[in-house]
Regions:
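Ser/Thr/Pro/Gly-rich low-complexity linker/stalk segments immediately outside membranes or between
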Residues: 25-45
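Short, well-ordered helical secondary-structure segments
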Residues: 12, 26, 30, 79-84
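Serine/threonine-rich low-complexity intrinsically disordered regions
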Residues: 1-5, 30, 70, 130
C-alpha cells in the first residue's frame, strides 16, 4: 500500500510539473507575442509620423513654388520641420526590436536620416541659392 501511495504521489508530481511547464510555455509565448505587437505598433507609428512630416514638407514646398507663401515663411516652417524630423528619428533608438528585426530597424533609421539630410540640403539651397546644395538634395532623395 505504501508503494502504491508513493507511486501516486510521484505520478501527481509529474502531472503537476507537466501542467506547470505547459502554463509557463504558454505564458512566455503570450508575452513574446505582446512584445512583438507593441514593437510593431511603435514602429508603425514612427513610420506614419515620418510620412506625415514629409507630406507637410512637400506641401509647403509646393505652396512656396506657387507663390502662396514667402521664402521667410517657408524657412520658418522648415526650422520646425527639421526639429520634428530629428525628434521622430530619435524614437528609433527607443525601440526594442526582436533580434530578427534589428537590421531592418537600422535600415529604416538610416533611410530617415538620409531623407533628413536631403531636406537640409534643399533648405540650404532655398536659403543661399547654391545649386550644389540642390543637386546634393536631389541625389540624396534618389537614394
Amino acid at each position: 500500500m505504501k508503494k502504491k501511495k508513493i507511486q501516486n504521489i510521484i505520478i501527481l508530481a509529474i502531472a503537476i510539473l507537466i501542467i506547470g511547464s505547459i502554463i509557463a510555455y504558454n505564458y512566455s509565448t503570450d508575452i513574446t507575442k505582446q512584445k512583438g505587437l507593441q514593437f510593431g505598433n511603435e514602429l508603425s507609428q514612427i513610420e506614419s509620423n515620418i510620412s506625415d512630416i514629409q507630406g507637410k514638407f512637400y506641401s509647403e514646398k509646393t505652396k512656396w513654388v506657387e507663390g502662396d507663401i514667402s521664402k521667410e515663411e517657408l524657412l520658418k516652417f522648415y526650422e520646425i520641420h527639421i526639429n520634428n524630423f530629428r525628434e521622430t528619428i530619435s524614437k528609433y533608438n527607443e525601440l526594442t526590436p526582436p533580434e530578427l528585426f534589428q537590421s531592418s530597424v537600422a535600415l529604416l533609421k538610416i533611410s530617415a536620416e538620409t531623407q533628413l539630410e536631403s531636406d537640409l540640403q534643399f533648405i540650404e539651397w532655398v536659403k543661399t541659392g547654391d545649386e550644389s546644395a540642390k543637386i546634393r538634395s536631389d541625389t540624396l532623395f534618389q537614394e
